[in-house]
A protein has these predicted regions:
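Short phosphate-engaging motifs
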Residues: 28, 38, 169, 201, ...
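A generic "binding-loop/recognition-motif" signal
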Residues: 16, 26, 263
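Well-ordered beta-strand positions
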Residues: 12, 21-22
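Flexible "cap/lid" subdomain of the alpha/beta-hydrolase fold that forms the substrate-access gate
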Residues: 1-9, 16-18, 56, 63-99, ...
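Conserved HGGG/HGGXW glycine-rich cap/lid loop of the alpha/beta-hydrolase fold
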Residues: 22-67
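A short, glycine- and basic residue-enriched loop/turn
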Residues: 38-39, 106, 263-264
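Catalytic histidine-centered segment of alpha/beta-hydrolase-like enzymes
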Residues: 263-272, 276
Length: 285
């Protein structure tokens, strides 16, 4: 699913060239994807919200057509946040509506804390508040669900596993986890495989995880976030339990949560109409 009205462009920020897709005019809505995705995970949202905003769906550093630094140290939260800050300013905006899923959501949480003046509204899809995730990792149930993160700490083996049998693990991640198996066409799966197969991409993508336990998300205390926030959560997420959302209101002053039953981690791809409706309602569109 590629719209001819989508424009592909690049911007250099924080010493790195980032690729993004954009459509629309007006205030900035910035979309941050997760693992193992790229800008394409927002294919059902870009045109819908381009009716109201300048939508920018970026490839995070290391992904798809964005630059892929080789050093593991390049994949830490401080660098991700500098990328986003520079992207917003480079697009000549002072602030944005920030939308993030999975890893993109983790970056969005941290960015909203670090730069609340640059985030008008925060919209988070299937990633818990960092404090809640840290709490969750102390429980046996979530530790088991997150066991893949420990596998990803190993050198080279995760890359070999991901590449084997024509990226079968990647296909299984989407189609196997999805409640609605029709949410991903074979063309969608091929798009994700092609992005992961780009030179240096797999190691870059995995390096996000290889730094995670030394990074800021798990090694700080979190205050009250003043940015108005919407969380949307697919309840059948096999990697992140719904219980990780409980108590988020202790960390976010103005919070709404919308749960979607019978929906997996890939919430905006599996239930795009409902996700779009919840975002539109939240923004008063």
């Amino acid at each position: 699913m590629i719209e001819t009205s989508w424009k592909h462009d690049y911007i250099t920020t924080n010493g790195i060239k980032l690729h993004y897709v954009t459509q629309g005019e007006g205030a900035l809505m910035l979309m941050l994807h997760g693992f193992p995705e790229f800008w394409y995970s927002w294919r059902h949202q870009i045109s819908e919200f381009a009716k109201y905003f300048k939508v920018v769906a970026v490839d995070l550093r290391g992904y798809n057509d964005s630059e892929k630094p080789q050093e593991k140290s390049a994949y830490v939260m401080d660098e991700f946040m500098k990328d986003i800050q520079g992207l917003i300013k480079g697009l000549e905006y002072e602030k944005c509506i920030l939308v993030g899923h999975d890893w993109g959501g983790a970056i969005a949480w941290c960015f909203a804390y670090a730069h609340p003046e640059m985030v008008e509204r925060l919209i988070i899809l299937n990633i818990p508040h960092p404090a809640k995730f840290s709490e969750g990792l102390r429980t046996p149930g979530q530790l088991l669900k997150s066991s893949y993160m420990f596998l990803f700490q190993l050198p080279w083996l995760p890359e070999l596993l991901m590449q084997s049998l024509d990226y079968q693990l990647l296909e299984n991640a989407f189609k196997g986890m999805a409640v609605n198996k029709n949410a991903f066409s074979q063309a969608d799966i091929e798009a994700y495989k092609n992005a992961a197969a780009k030179r240096g991409a797999l190691t870059a993508m995995l390096n996000y995880y290889r730094n995670i336990f030394q990074d800021k998300m798990f090694n700080k205390s979190w205050g009250i976030l003043e940015v108005p926030t919407l969380m949307i959560w697919g309840e059948k997420d096999t990697a992140l339990g719904k219980e990780l959302t409980y108590g988020t209101e202790a960390y976010v002053r103005d919070l709404q949560i919308k749960y979607i039953p019978d929906c997996s981690h890939w919430v905006q791809q599996e239930q795009p109409e409902l996700v779009n409706q919840y975002i539109q309602d939240y923004l008063g569109l």
